[in-house]
Amino acid sequence: MKKIECVIMDWAGTAVDYGCFAPVAAFLKAFAEKGLTVTMEEARGPMGMTKIDHIRELFKLPSVTEQFKQNYNRNWTEEDVVSIYKEFEKHLFASLEEYTTPIPGVIEVIEKLKRDGIKIGSTTGYTTAMMNIVLPDRKS
């Protein structure tokens, strides 16, 4: 049997904020501010991507594309993606600290992995600035 050398953990939506409540709420608010309705199911669809790519994918949904055309009499552009991303970030940063509690057992698993000499890596769809809020003491 091979020895495990490294474990890669996903943070946002898995180790903390299981279920991705913080970004989903921020996506819904950011789109709503532009007069666009996105369902919770639709908002969850592209989870795992960078957040700007996630927003771009939501714009590609037929329902969102049609709403945008009806509201603005034009097709959406990359400028619209960036505009919603800025609103998304504002909402996410405002609520992120509420969703930083690790799921039960995560801290203990990390401590055991460290004791056993197993390297720990991480991945996330959050930016570095977002992770600095989620895991302010992540080095320890």
Model-predicted regions and their roles:
Residues K2-I107, E111, R115-K119, A129-N132:
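N-terminal helical cap/lid subdomain that shapes the substrate entry/recognition surface
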Residues T124-Y126:
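Conserved phosphate-coupling serine/threonine residues in phosphotransfer and NTP-handling enzymes
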Residues S140:
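Conserved small/polar residues in nucleotide/adenosyl-binding loops
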